[in-house]
């Protein structure tokens, strides 16, 4: 079952988020995962409307995957953008129908709400990293940029 994220989902999402944190290369740039900080940031974003998203709930009523997006406007011409902040499925659920439905739910939301652009990302270290290029291209996306990060402290 795919449903909208509720503020009450933040603890469960933080648990999955920590798995992502450890699986990806994120920890090597940002340090240790802070579950309380992650929960607060997600809760605030959901409460003030800067974040929205969806969860995939399994037969045991546990969240198996989630997608968080942010609504934005382009600086150069105010075209509307729905930007993925985080899309994560437990490794055992990647490529499964429910995880893919999260993507399609977000895409449908962007179309139904007349967004001009839908931006998806990928982070190094995750086992599905190399597969995402071909998946996104099949869905009509084009690569725009790569980000580089330098740790300053």
Predicted stretch roles:
Residues 101-117:
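Conserved acyl-CoA
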Residues 1-15:
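A short beta-loop-alpha structural element at the N-terminal edge
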Residues 85-96:
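A short, internal acetyl-CoA/4′-phosphopantetheine-binding micro-motif in the GNAT/acyltransferase core
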Residues 55, 61-71:
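Conserved beta-strand in the GNAT
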Residues 73-84, 144:
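A conserved beta-turn-beta hairpin within the catalytic core of GNAT-like acetyltransferases
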Residues 118-132, 151-152:
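Conserved beta-strand-loop-alpha-helix junction that forms the acyl-donor binding cleft
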Residues 40-55:
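A short helix-loop-beta-strand connector motif used in the catalytic cores of GNAT acetyltransferases and
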Residues 21-41:
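Conserved GNAT-fold acetyl-CoA-binding loop/helix
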């Amino acid at each position: 079952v795919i449903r909208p994220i509720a503020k009450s989902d933040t603890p469960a999402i933080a648990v999955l988020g920590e798995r992502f944190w450890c699986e990806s290369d994120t920890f090597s740039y940002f340090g240790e995962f802070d579950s309380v900080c992650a929960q607060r940031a997600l809760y605030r974003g959901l409460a003030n409307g800067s974040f929205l998203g969806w969860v995939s709930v399994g037969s045991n009523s546990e969240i198996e995957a989630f997608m968080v997006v942010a609504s934005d406007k382009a600086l150069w011409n105010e075209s509307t953008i729905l930007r993925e902040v985080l899309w994560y499925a437990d490794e055992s659920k990647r490529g499964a129908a429910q995880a893919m439905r999260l993507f399609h739910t977000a895409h449908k939301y962007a179309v139904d709400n007349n967004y001009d652009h839908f931006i998806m990302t990928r982070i190094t270290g995750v086992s599905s990293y190399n597969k995402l290029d071909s998946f996104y291209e099949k869905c009509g996306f084009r690569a725009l940029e790569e980000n580089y990060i330098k740790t300053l402290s």
